A protein has these predicted regions:
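Alpha-helical transmembrane segments and adjacent TM-loop junctions that form the membrane-embedded core
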Residues: 1-167
């Protein structure tokens, strides 16, 4: 087995389906990282997108439900379930999200944008940009950030360059 080998696509898809089934308000599952320590010894981490209205109590209940379901159904121990808060209370944020997504996805090599959140009070915009391997990742990332910053000069753009490590 090769160290750092990509997670089997069907296994990753099945695991993500289990996670998203934990609650109807989970909007997406991203950044799956799985470590393989031999047969029956897998440890994983993942991010989920949830509404900005969720409480810490609800997040705790859902992440524990995910951890249990993933272990019971797949034999994978979840080291962490990270959370991306997405705007649900703000029509302005939804419009900005649509505009930013269109601009970002127009760049060749960009596969996905996720974890998007706009904070109107602090004028911050946060998201992850997944750029394909085999491309000029850092150059594409810098171009994306520059374009978004130019389109939204009043906002502080905080974008994370993300890697395509699982399906």
């Amino acid at each position: 087995k090769i160290l750092g080998e990509r997670v089997d696509a069907s296994f990753a898809t099945s695991l993500k389906k289990t996670i998203i089934a934990a609650d109807k308000e989970i909007h997406g599952v991203f950044d799956l990282i799985m470590n393989d320590y031999g047969p029956g010894r897998h440890i994983a981490s993942v991010h989920i997108e949830v509404p900005d209205t969720w409480t810490a109590d609800r997040i705790d209940r859902v992440t524990r439900k995910i951890t249990n379901a993933v272990y019971e159904q797949h034999g994978v121990a979840m080291a962490a379930v990270g959370v991306y808060s997405i705007n649900t209370k703000n029509d302005v944020a939804a419009k900005i999200h649509a505009q930013v997504s269109k601009l970002v996805l127009a760049h060749e090599g960009v596969m996905q944008i996720h974890g998007f959140f706009v904070d109107e009070e602090t004028k911050q915009m946060r998201f992850d940009v997944m750029v394909a391997f085999g491309t000029k990742r850092k150059e594409i990332y810098k171009d994306v950030i520059a374009e978004i910053q130019q389109a939204f000069p009043d906002y502080n753009v905080q974008a994370q360059l993300d890697s395509d490590i699982s399906d």
